[in-house]
């Protein structure tokens, strides 16, 4: 557990939790919105001021309050949320760092799965992929074979750049399987290409990333996948609205989705 991540004991009845992501890009409004899903995670600085959720809260340590802990307590008192635990990180984390730090600190005994892991390996998580790669725990083609764990036993499932590689005809059934594998109160994280954002970029002739020029290879890559090995082809396509509707139809009790450049990110709680 990194020393820079510290649990803050809140002096309020209800504790607060949230998903940090790349902290300096997440507003307080987004942070609070994800807290309703009950995700243990991180929040780092005093510059995340939101208007889109009508909160408009800012607290800078040493200015508005003596310490960062005082800021967080004040925030929790003003916006109480039924959730898990609140964490603070002095150094911004990327998504996977925040995710792993929060969950490892909260309860290392939870069964956690990383589906379609590829080279994105996490510790304390069962990493599953269709290919035999370094540090993959289970080799399984999840488009053909079921998730190899009993129903109701998994606390947390990550599907980062995975769902789009399944046939669109199988996505709904697969997500129902994911739902069934989760414990009550378990949750899933999904990252996938955001077709709405990609198509707007194409129409407006905007560059997708700083390291790409606007050309047919760029469009083909973001829509169709890398296609450098058989499994790396996109076969299902989503927008934030359609993935949100799918999760709702399957039965997830709470969902939150946001755009992240050419991708969307969703968290959903069973």
State each model region's role.
Residues 1-66:
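Alpha-helical substrate-recognition element adjacent to the catalytic core
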Residues 5, 57, 81-84, 154:
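Local beta-strand N-terminus motif with an aromatic residue
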Residues 8-9, 86, 111-113, 126:
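Conserved beta-strand elements of the Class I
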Residues 35, 103, 186:
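A short helix->loop->beta-strand "cap" motif at the edges of active sites that frequently abuts
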Residues 68-93:
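Conserved Lys-Pro-Asp/Glu-containing loop-to-beta segment of HAD-superfamily phosphomonoesterases
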Residues 86-111:
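Acidic, Mg2+-coordinating phosphoryl-transfer loop and its flanking beta/alpha structural elements
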Residues 113-198, 266-270:
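Conserved SAM-binding loop
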Residues 168-270:
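S-adenosyl-L-methionine-dependent methyltransferase catalytic module, highlighting the catalytic core
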């Amino acid at each position: 557990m990194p020393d820079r991540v510290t649990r803050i004991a809140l002096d309020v009845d209800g504790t607060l939790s949230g998903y940090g992501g790349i902290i300096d890009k997440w507003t307080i409004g987004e942070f609070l919105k994800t807290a309703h899903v009950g995700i243990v995670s991180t929040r780092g600085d005093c510059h995340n001021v939101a208007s889109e959720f009508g909160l408009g809260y800012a607290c800078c340590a040493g200015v508005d309050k003596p310490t960062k802990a005082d800021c967080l307590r004040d925030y929790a008192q003003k916006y109480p949320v039924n959730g898990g635990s609140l964490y603070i990180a002095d150094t911004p984390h990327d998504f996977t760092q925040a995710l792993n730090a929060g969950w490892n600190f909260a309860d290392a005994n939870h069964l956690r799965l990383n589906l379609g892991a590829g080279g994105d390996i996490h510790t304390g998580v069962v990493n599953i992929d269709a290919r035999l790669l370094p540090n993959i725990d289970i080799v399984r083609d999840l488009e053909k074979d079921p998730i190899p764990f009993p129903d109701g036993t998994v606390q947390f499932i990550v599907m980062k750049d995975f769902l789009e590689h399944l046939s669109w005809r199988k996505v709904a059934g697969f997500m129902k399987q994911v739902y069934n594998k989760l414990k009550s109160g378990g949750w899933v994280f999904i990252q996938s290409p955001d077709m709405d954002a990609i198509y707007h970029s194409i129409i407006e002739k905007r560059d997708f990333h700083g390291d790409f020029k606007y050309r047919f290879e760029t469009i083909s890559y973001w829509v169709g996948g890398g296609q450098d090995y058989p499994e790396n082809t996109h076969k299902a396509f989503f927008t934030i609205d359609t993935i949100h509707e799918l999760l709702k139809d399957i039965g997830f009790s709470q969902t939150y989705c946001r755009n992240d450049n050419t991708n969307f990110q969703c968290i959903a709680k069973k």
